[in-house]
Amino acid sequence: MIQIPSDLNPGLVPLAFLLGTWEGAGVFDFPGEEKCNFGQEVVFSHDGRDFLEYTSHTWVLDSEGKKVRPLESESGYWRIDKDRKVEVVMVRDQGVVEVWYGELADQKPQIDLSLIHI
């Protein structure tokens, strides 16, 4: 069950399912880059204003799943309007700024986003 904090801005209730700390692991495999295992931690938080704060950190993992070194980090803000349109503005540690727009699906926790600006 999703818990909605009492101090969450009412306009952000549709995004409440994102709040908290999320962790996972995968394989980093991009052309021109060294393939490696990685771990990721994503945190969505709020302070009562009309946006969610987002941070993400990834690390290279060894064969036992232990952190070897930082891989990438990014941070930004998520907003939603009354028509369920979502805007994400984030900056990556390489100095790249991304703006994503999309829509929150009806009746399920799914957001479809498209990159608009880099």
Specify the residue positions occupied by each region the protein language model found:
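Flexible, membrane-facing loop/turn or short amphipathic-helix motifs
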Residues: 28-34, 62-66
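N-terminal helix-cap/turn-to-beta initiation motif at the start of protein domains
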Residues: 7-21
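A short, structured loop/turn motif at beta-sheet edges
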Residues: 44-50, 79-84, 102-110
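Conserved small/polar residues in nucleotide/adenosyl-binding loops
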Residues: 116-118
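Amphipathic hydrophobic-ligand
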Residues: 35-39, 70
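Helix-adjacent hinge/juxtasegments
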Residues: 63-102
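Short hydrophobic/aromatic-rich beta-strand segments that constitute the beta-sheet cores
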Residues: 24, 52-56, 86-90, 110-114
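N-terminal glycine/threonine-rich, aromatic-flanked beta-hairpin/loop signature
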Residues: 39-61
